[in-house]
């Protein structure tokens, strides 16, 4: 049960284990799932947020239903690379999930993925597809989750999660030392 970098997450997956991408918003959680070969991300749904416990139960059910073993969670880093309140909220949600393995029936693992501009990119694509505003509003969160997960899958296929890319390798306390506190705090 840990927060890992992307390559460690892949190494910990059981054979044919799937990943689920999350786009955590204030009102909804967009969900996407990978194929067993970790090549393609598909949008699968949205959870309307209520209370953490209910959100976590719905997420656990979605993971079990799709044989998902680990999560790639979009981290809304500021444009200058700093982490603001939204990142703190995402990290806290992830930390709380990891404290409840009984919900999942296994110990889930999480990797963060820099999601800067993911929703904007998805909205531009959907406008290009001539989707109505109403339809875009209905699917934007799960499409953003698929965009986030696909970026992570593409990185995994490259076999390189080196610092400087989009793979956020910071641990729970925001540094890269793998320990609680006392790290460099710098990330990449």
From Swiss-Prot:
One Pfam match: RuvX
Superkingdom classification of source: Bacteria
Comp. bias intervals (Acidic residues): 166-188
SMART domains assigned: YqgFc
Compartment(s): Cytoplasm
GO CC annotation terms, alphabetical: cytosol
Predominant subcellular localization, coarse grouping: cytoplasm
Enzyme class per UniProt: hydrolase
Ranges for region Disordered: 156-188
BP GO terms, sorted: rRNA 5'-end processing
EC numbers, comma separated: 3.1.-.-
HAMAP family: Nuclease_YqgF
This protein's name: Putative pre-16S rRNA nuclease
Species this protein is from: Rhodospirillum centenum (strain ATCC 51521 / SW)
